[in-house]
Amino acid sequence: MLSLPRLWTHTGPLTLLLLPVAWFFASLVTVRRLAFRRGWLTRVDVGIPVIVVGNITAGGSGKTPLVIWLTNWLREQGHRPGVVSRGYGGKARRCVELGAESTAAEVGDEPLLIHRKTGAPVVVGRDRPAAARVLRARHPEVDIIVSDDGLQHYRLGRALELAVLDAATGFGNGWPLPAGPLREPFRRLHEVDGVVQVVRGGGAWRTYLGLKTWRADYRAGDARRLRAPEERKPLRALAQREWLAATGIGRPEGFFAMLEAHGVRHRPRAFPDHHAFRPDDLPAGGAVLMTEKDAVKCADFAGPDWWAVDLEVVPEAGFVEWLRTRLGS
């Protein structure tokens, strides 16, 4: 069966069948965006600066690692950041603040990973302005908010918009959802404040006419054992054996290519993005490698030889300086 992400890489008969739905979707997006620009619908000002990090394409683009980098960087600059997120894949129906007992099933895998890797307060909720209000009420010390995957949530006022692109996949076949991966038209990128292209495995990045973009390299760090997170090994130290590489992320081929670049022999197994892992999905006694995003859902039933690979993005110096100037820090 042809999966949607694969469908989005080319234009075929099924693409053409979906075009009427895609045009209808694109029209709704355009009208809604226009309503906010003209003031027919109003944005909510939460009283402190909001940085929105998102993308105009569906699927993985490296957005979550950039949110983690940005949140940690803001703290290094003397800010006290907090994060709001939709909590995709979680069951929470109201605004929920993440804590030590939070699970991916409740709040979503990406917010849980952000919280654990930054230590920043994180609130998830379908209503972004409401989530931001809860965050401010519970953490009055927060002086700046990072909105995870919030580019299309126009109701939340924002001081800065950052769009993230995957340099390898770009805009796919260029069609709107569901015929293609576009949540919004390409021209939306000319309205945001900055565009970051995430480059995996030292690959090339793309040049788009009239569009200024910065580069951020997607890098693999150490691997850590799920049952004993304090036990860490360089990724190349795992190259002496074959692994089952299992992941439920938007662009699994990027993870597999990264393992290959580090000489790690593996059998790839891709699950749907945000997959809710169960104990019988993977061999309990096998040697398994996964991403950190997957690990937050597997820690409770991990086998003794299951490991998670630290993944991070490192933006180029020019982007960091631009960001520092824009924020006045």
UniProtKB/Swiss-Prot annotation:
ATP binds at residues 57-64. SUPFAM superfamilies: P-loop containing nucleoside triphosphate hydrolases (SSF52540). GO terms for biological process: lipid A biosynthetic process; lipopolysaccharide core region biosynthetic process. Disulfide bonds: none annotated. It catalyses: a lipid A disaccharide + ATP = a lipid IVA + ADP + H(+). One of its GO terms (molecular function) is ATP binding. The keyword Nucleotide-binding applies. This is Tetraacyldisaccharide 4'-kinase. It comes from Thiobacillus denitrificans (strain ATCC 25259 / T1). The lineage of its organism: Bacteria, Pseudomonadati, Pseudomonadota, Betaproteobacteria, Nitrosomonadales. The gene is lpxK.
